[in-house]
Amino acid sequence: MRTRFYNARVLTMKDFDIFLGEVWVEDNKIIYVGKVKDSSFCFDREIDVQKNLIMPGFINAHTHSGMTFLRSMADDMPLQQWLNEKVFPIETKLSEEDIYYFSKLAILEYLTSGITTNFDMYLNPEAIIKASLDMKYRTVLCGAVNDFCLSVEDVERCFNEYNQENSLISYVLGFSHEYTNSKEKIQQVAALSHKYKAPVYTHLSETEYEVNTCKEKTGLSPVEYLCDLGVYDYGGGAFHCVHMSEHDLDLFKEKHLNIVTNPASNLKLASGIAPIQAMLQKKINICLGTDGPASNNCLDMFREMFLATGLAKYKNCDASAVDAYEVLKMATINGAKALNLNCGVLEAGKLADLIILDLHQPNMQPIHNIAKNIVYSGSKSNVKCTMVNGEILYEDGHFYVGFEIDALYDEVQKRVERLMR
């Protein structure tokens, strides 16, 4: 399958220069990015982009797709109460099939937001993988070892199985939280990382309560504790990282770890504001994630981008902190770097994960600076087209995912009502 996008404003993300040109795709790879040129190629489809913007798709570097069933069911409470009173009890009722359908709903929402990859952590990886493959969507799974259900053996099996099967799916070692795992369990994950020389990810330093409890228990911050156990000897990183000391950040810099910030979720749960400017000053690779639809509650990278820069400016009392260019990198190329994916920029040889943003809408006019428009005034309504792995899955408000959308909504509602009984 060969697709030609022409008459396009092109933002490659290799830099922020935007030019009028073309992007050619063959099968799942980009084969040309540049100015208009003649070619003897025969294309299966040629798309006039009408001087709208074509750019790399967003990478949602932290989410829980299967939690769509909790959207607006448990709100207006802090993290620990939310988890212990609402989330954990109802999760015991979930079936693999439930998670499959709930994940499909999340993927639809990712597509409308221009998200072409998600880094997903939830209870049943098989269900999320099946949903992703059925919809031809790119997903990186993260192990979610904890003391209640998922074992280290489960994660090792998934790591070996799902890094071989399909180019749309990959699997990263991980565990849910420091406080939901015994020291022995975390040491087992670290041993697995050493065995495969593989990175590890987890939720980390999300709340003051978590940090203080870890210090009382171990005498160390969560970051120091995990480093002491050898968790990060082969890299990786963490989600949230809201309450980080200077020493914590130095450890992340020293070990070349990645941080995924989740501003909307951290605001809604009153967890705090991550010190993004301080992280950037230490040249830590920062990515952007929505967190799950239960704690956010929407899967919208435009909102995350605006909040990432806006909250950093507020926290530092500095209007120049964390500018639009830094945030766009967090949403694209930085996520690709953290997840070791061959995407995040538009250039020949990269995976054909790209989006078209509608510039012919009031919120994107006038065109002084398109990159800033995306971050400061862009919205999901500007997403005209989302291509994943060379296939258009969303275009002009229509999904091309192989099933009736309303039928999925009905199925999800039926399953949610069963869980609520």
Describe every region a protein language model picked out.
Residues 208-220, 248-252, 270-279, 296-313:
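Histidine/acidic-residue-rich catalytic or RNA/ligand-binding cores of hydrolases
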Residues 228-235, 277-360, 377-380:
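His/Asp/Glu-enriched, well-ordered alpha-helical/loop segment
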Residues 69-101, 135-143, 208-235, 255-258, ...:
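Active-site gating loops and adjacent loop-to-helix segments of metal-dependent hydrolytic enzymes
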